[in-house]
UniProtKB/Swiss-Prot annotation:
The gene is SCPL12. This is Serine carboxypeptidase-like 12. Disulfide bonds join 80-323, 244-258, 282-289. It comes from Arabidopsis thaliana. GO terms for biological process: proteolysis. InterPro entries: AB_hydrolase_fold, Peptidase_S10. It holds the Pfam family Peptidase_S10. SUPFAM superfamilies: alpha/beta-Hydrolases. Glycans are attached at residues 101, 313, 336, 344, 376, 420. GO terms for molecular function: serine-type carboxypeptidase activity. Probable carboxypeptidase. It is found in: Secreted. Belongs to the peptidase S10 family. It comes from the Eukaryota.
Amino acid sequence: MKSTPKLLLLLLFIINHHVDSGSIVKFLPGFEGPLPFELETGYIGIGEEEDVQLFYYFIKSERNPKEDPLLLWLSGGPGCSSITGLLFENGPLALKSKVYNGSVPSLVSTTYSWTKTANIIFLDQPIGAGFSYSRIPLIDTPSDTGEVKNIHEFLQKWLSKHPQFSSNPFYASGDSYSGMIVPALVQEISKGNYICCKPPINLQGYILGNPITYFEVDQNYRIPFSHGMALISDELYESIRRDCKGNYFNVDPRNTKCLKLVEEYHKCTDELNEFNILSPDCDTTSPDCFLYPYYLLGYWINDESVRDALHVNKSSIGKWERCTYQNRIPYNKDINNSIPYHMNNSISGYRSLIYSGDHDLVVPFLATQAWIKSLNYSIIHEWRPWMIKDQIAGYTRTYSNKMTFATVKGSGHTAEYKPNETFIMFQRWISGHDL
């Protein structure tokens, strides 16, 4: 009987250690049978008191997890849950597009998961995004620079709890608004690796899809993109160029000619699906809509059985929302231009893959090409098509700063529009091969 307290203490230690390190998920409601891959979910506490709890989904590589690269995936927004990447862009599961009937929506396996060749951490950030939360009221408004430091701390703590992945090549990745966070994060990790007494992160590079980089410039390139895609007439294009002088969306109220022309531009484009101009602009609650699975996602992830299976802290969050910061949570966008971070990361010698769906109106490929050109690195491999079998899947170019730019033909703002092509592009690049 005297040994009982010691046994209880040991048991508590084991339980606490298990919770801190994450919990293995073997089954998910909506998916038949055990998961055909290893999924871990959990929280990592940030700050001295660890009041900020960042939620993650970790999926081991299906090939060789001990040696394959470790990726961190951040969804955009800011404030969109990373499970949108997992279930819609590059994960091993997807929601089956079937009319909602009141039961838990179904999940199916995918053929295009990046986890076939990489370990991936899908991270919900900032605080309030997905299942990440704070135990106490926030004192400071979440911000770009604040999130960079939080994510860096997350990675350090996650790797200390998963030391078997410390030597794996590490890549930061994401799309859309992550274009403001990932380059700064790479620089932060790079600097942190030189600080004494902390195990270095084996940083090798980064990957960004349709990244927001310099919002005003990104936005202005919508005009030449729209002209090139035959969305506006030659006459309107020439007039708007002449009278707006390259500034189309932050117009001086006194420039009435420009304002009128911009109004004409909106008449031509406002009814488009700006995320992919080839796709219908329709209500996601319609089963005929390409994005109907987003509607199903809300029902799936808010089901109590799903949240239990994912080991979500019951007291942490109410109704899950796909993107929170766009509507109701304050956020300080204090990085307005991420080009200097790209420059610093290039100087430091990190590899990068920057890809653009070529039918995205939100961040047109022309804007991405422009800031890459502004880095002023020489071209190593000239513009050429990259192929899948005997078909052109997009176009690519490589630069002397180890940066590869690629378009994905027919794709939009995120990889979900062409997941198979994006997967093949990623698989070739991460393996060090030409696209």
